[in-house]
């Protein structure tokens, strides 16, 4: 029988087939159903997201099924953009907020086809108790949650890095390791790195507090007396 690999417990002597025609057809159907509720790839929050990369591998770009009703873009937060039109209800953001950062701001609400991710009591993100750690952004596979600095007015990503640099957060003494995404020698965004102190996690300062780099009072060369 077919079963999701994430819930099937292995047992001794089990034989697993992942590339049978039945399994591949089932995966394609799942992606086609998910694509039906997505904006087109060109208008999605992140055309280069994990979701669209996997969709391309599965050979699924369009769907024969009707889509859900469009959900308006939420730009109420200064640092993050919310486009639930691209959400696939995977619950990764919920778990990132609740289990990884233990903030418990994000949850699932409503039932059936109306089920969706909410902040607190279905408040706009910018009016919720969100502490802006950005763990949900790092976990999201579709771009439904994105750094505001990366998207245009329509909520589509337009800024991509040309290289990444491993670094350490300069604020407190914890020593959180970071992965800095750079374009034209300017920082676009920062992700958490799997270091011993932070294990991929960051706080609001580590993820979004890099504007000091452009401050006119910052020393960029050694001072010699």
Task: State each model region's role.
Residues 5-11:
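Structured interaction patches on ligand/partner-binding surfaces of diverse proteins
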């Amino acid at each position: 029988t077919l079963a999701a690999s994430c819930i099937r417990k292995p047992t001794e002597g089990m034989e697993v087939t992942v590339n049978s025609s039945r399994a591949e057809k089932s995966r394609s159907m799942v992606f086609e159903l998910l694509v039906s509720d997505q904006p087109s790839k060109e208008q999605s929050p992140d055309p280069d997201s994990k979701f669209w990369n996997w969709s391309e591998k599965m050979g699924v770009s369009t769907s024969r099924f009707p889509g859900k009703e469009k959900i308006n873009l939420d730009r109420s937060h200064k640092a993050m953009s919310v486009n639930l039109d691209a959400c696939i209800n995977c619950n990764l953001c919920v778990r990132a907020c609740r289990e990884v950062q233990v903030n418990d701001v994000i949850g699932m609400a409503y039932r059936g086809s109306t089920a969706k991710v909410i902040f607190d009591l279905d408040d706009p993100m910018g009016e919720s108790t969100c502490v802006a750690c950005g763990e949900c952004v790092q976990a999201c596979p579709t771009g439904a949650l994105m750094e505001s600095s990366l998207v245009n007015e329509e909520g589509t990503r337009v800024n991509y890095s040309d290289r990444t640099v491993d670094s350490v957060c300069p604020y407190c003494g914890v020593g959180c390791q970071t992965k800095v995404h750079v374009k034209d020698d300017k920082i676009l965004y920062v992700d958490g790195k799997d270091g011993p102190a932070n294990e991929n996690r960051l706080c609001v300062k580590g993820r979004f507090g890099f504007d000091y780099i452009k401050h006119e009072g910052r020393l960029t060369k050694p001072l010699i007396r």
